[in-house]
Amino acid sequence: MDIYSKLELYDAIHRHYSRDSELITSIAKRAGNPVLELAAGTGRLAQLIVDLGYNYTGLDLSGEFIDVARAKYGKRTTFVVGDMQQFHLSKQFNFIFIGFNSFLHNLTDQEANRCLNCVRNHLTKDGLFLVSIFIPDPSFLYRETGKLYPATSLFEYDGSRCRIMETNEFDDETQVNQLTWRLERDG
């Protein structure tokens, strides 16, 4: 299942995720205005910055996701369609962050370096940069191939209580973990 092609499902899955909220808010307060989020998706984390009264810019590769984010926040924020590996904005930011494992969409060292170079070019001299990434336990990477494991708790979607089940396949050589998600309705 490609959750990036189902915007309502993407939002439903991530709606209640908040483990990163306190850290992002704390660092934003320390860094100050303005703030840039890379891989902003539909804007789940934008509200944290808006609530601080800061100028927020969100960048995402998906024009559809950016359209949803713009509809949610209107003129209180700026959302830009762009690639975190090669963006050129006309200003610098005191705080740049990439939330919820999105940095891991850079699948090679070259892609990661391009992203980090763009961040460096857009970060003020004393600015702060936060990357949230998943560091898996090896037992997660080497789970039984083809076996379904719960990936989310129950959530509401399309009038039903649902959960995501996943399988994964880890490639030792490339260090890429390929997840496949399946939506299951409860009951």
Per-region residue spans from a language model:
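A conserved beta-strand element that flanks and buttresses the S-adenosyl-L-methionine
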Residues: F97-G99
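Conserved class I S-adenosyl-L-methionine
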Residues: M1-N33
